[in-house]
């Protein structure tokens, strides 16, 4: 049986942790002038992937 391939886009976006996967939050790439400093600071924090999305990500990262 051939090796399972890792989805490289998913590999770059998600990191495996003991409790699931962590990810970066969206809305911090452009159009930042109208967003408050507090909002941008909170968006810098990493967050957990929703439990319903974990199986799909785990399938795409077979060796994580």
Curated annotation (Swiss-Prot):
GO molecular function, one term: structural constituent of ribosome
Disulphide linkage map: none
Record InterPro entries: Ribosomal_bL35, Ribosomal_bL35-like, Ribosomal_bL35_CS, Ribosomal_bL35_sf
Keywords of the record: Ribonucleoprotein, Ribosomal protein
SUPFAM superfamilies: L35p-like
Biological process (GO), any one: translation
Family: Belongs to the bacterial ribosomal protein bL35 family.
NCBIfam families attached to this UniProt entry: rpmI_bact
Protein name: Large ribosomal subunit protein bL35
Gene: rpmI
């Amino acid at each position: 049986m051939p090796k399972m391939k890792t989805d490289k886009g998913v590999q770059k976006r998600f990191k495996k942790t003991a409790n699931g996967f962590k990810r970066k939050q969206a809305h911090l790439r452009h159009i930042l002038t109208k967003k408050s400093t507090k909002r941008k600071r909170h968006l810098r924090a990493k967050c957990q992937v929703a439990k319903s999305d974990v199986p799909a990500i785990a399938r795409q990262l077979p060796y994580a």
